[in-house]
Amino acid sequence: LAALLALSRQHRDKASIDALNLTALDREIKAARETAAGEGLVAVNIMKAVAEHPLLVRQACASGADAIVMGAGLPLDLPELTADYPKMALIPILSDARGIGLLIKKWLRKGRLPDAIVIEHPRYAGGHLGAARIEDLNDSRFDFDNVLSQTRQLLHDLQIEPEQIPLICAGGINTPQQVRQLLANGASAVQLGSAFAVSEEGDAHPEFKRVLAEAKAEDIVEFMSVAGLPARGVMTPWLKNYLKRESLLQSKARCGAERCAAGLHCLTVCGLRDGLAKFGQFCIDSQLAAAMRGEISKGLFFRGASRLPFGEAIRPVRELIEYMLLGRWPAALSGGQACITASG
């Protein structure tokens, strides 16, 4: 990784950066497969909003990934991009029944069904959110019960057996009671993001983990990303300063390639580069990279809204899984099990 980063500093043109990204992705997938030793699946999460998502999808297929997970937009082109790899599992991330219906009907015309669907609740999830506006995040159409029941009806109307498309709920899930309730209501599985990001085994910077784990409810905010989607993260010094200036920056938005601070043109549509006044006005690549390095003063730290299962404690993955699936609270955490609700 260090060698690739050094090369990226020497060659700043887009073609070179894209090639280095593909090399890095290839290495990570092969390393993951080696570690997995034939157990489980190796999946790659790719944002639809990323300009070179077709290249990344094709590289993931060629490198031996088992599944592609895609959100941050409707991944209507995934069947075409993976046509040469019919065994590749395709898992879109969506938030409401309308989007699910649109995608399934489009894919059916291409002779493909999703291998699973992640239903991500924008009221609770971290990062980019599946709503058009911040004002929509609490809309009841995103509630898991509504989406699950409406999707089951959709599958029935399309004569698709429910077992053909497992539904995976994501966002704000932090207790075994929630897991059991969702499974009882028709979910096939659940997905956790922030909780695993701060696990002992997670390879994130220690400061990255600390920022996520120690964030209080009042520290977590929603704002518009440069990708044109609402996003949720921790109110770090950088984000606090940016939000103070957001209206001013948006009023001065203008289109120009030189506005791309990193020169990467990483997004298909970018509020900063393309002069879109209703979008965010910052370089998301630079801010996320700073977070990756653990730079609290400069980083953008995406995080879900709810309290983490173990609060501020950073614990092993095994303990997290045992708690969420079996209700077994870690003996090492003093004071007994905390009272946790979906709203944090």
Where are these regions (language model features)?
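Generic beta-sheet signal
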Residues: 45, 93, 170, 192-193
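Conserved active-site-proximal phosphate/metal-binding subdomains
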Residues: 124-144, 148-164, 168, 174-344
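Active-site entrance/lid segments in N-terminal catalytic domains of soluble metabolic enzymes
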Residues: 1-161, 338-340
